[in-house]
Amino acid sequence: MTIHITGDTHSDVSRLLKYNQTKLNDTIIVTGDFGMLWRRNDYSKIELLEQDAITRNIMYLFCDGNHENFEMLEGYPEEEKYGGKVGKVSEHIYHLKRGEVYKI
């Protein structure tokens, strides 16, 4: 497993979908300003990323940045994963919460 790190995607889903350096069981971490969850009732970008994660058998993790919809982020169910609390956005997409330490 390899961990791939990027940041400041600012809702540019194509940037993540075009990245082709992953292998089975890899993880892509977005370190702030993920931006895919901005408008309520618009989950099209999350659906694209989830389908991509299923197809490539990878995980998407993200840390929030200052350009996020925090109200939406706080609405996702919280669970324990990677040794800390995460917000479960979908089966393959998790929000890494502030103040937590993770072992990935």
Regions found by a protein language model. Give the residues of each.
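Extreme N-terminal starter segment of soluble prokaryotic enzymes
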Residues: 1-4
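Core catalytic region of metal-dependent phosphoesterases/phosphodiesterases
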Residues: 6, 11-103
